[in-house]
Amino acid sequence: MKSYVGIGKGNAADAVGEAVKGIGNPSCIIFLSSFGQIGEIAAIIAEKFPGVPSIGTLGTKLANGKYGDDNLVVLGFYDDAKTECGVINDISLCPVASIGDIKDKVNKVSPGRENTVCIEFCTNDEEKLVTTFNSCLAQKGVKLAGGTVFGVPDGKKPIVAYNGKIFEDSCVYAIIKN
């Protein structure tokens, strides 16, 4: 499976420009940003790559041997990987309401037991999400990895990004088949 990892620093536009330099034509983008820039970065990525699904989270990043809180990391996947992305809203209330949508996305990638993973980033209520995802993924042998956002300033609500937009009380995910 062909993939790309890029790192950028500076203001949102410069960070995205640097991080996607050489990415080409991805079929899916996953990014990790800082709290202060995630909204602008999500919008820039959606504008630069129209029609390409993207998910994003925030926290401390490690990529290409570099570590930091103030950088942007972009991971790109290409057509040799089948991908489906989505968002689950109101996860503190009823994430199971999204089971039908998750199952549809899983079926679209035609997962195999050893070649498919679901990566998720959530704002809260990870324990509810694990149950929701497992009900959709376990029977197909799809592995689940991910976590809760980190690095939210005091007094602010945790957020994640999906296709250029920011969401609270939500989970974004990518199902990736090699």
Model segments located where?
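Cofactor- and metal-binding active-site motifs of prokaryotic enzymes
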Residues: 1-178
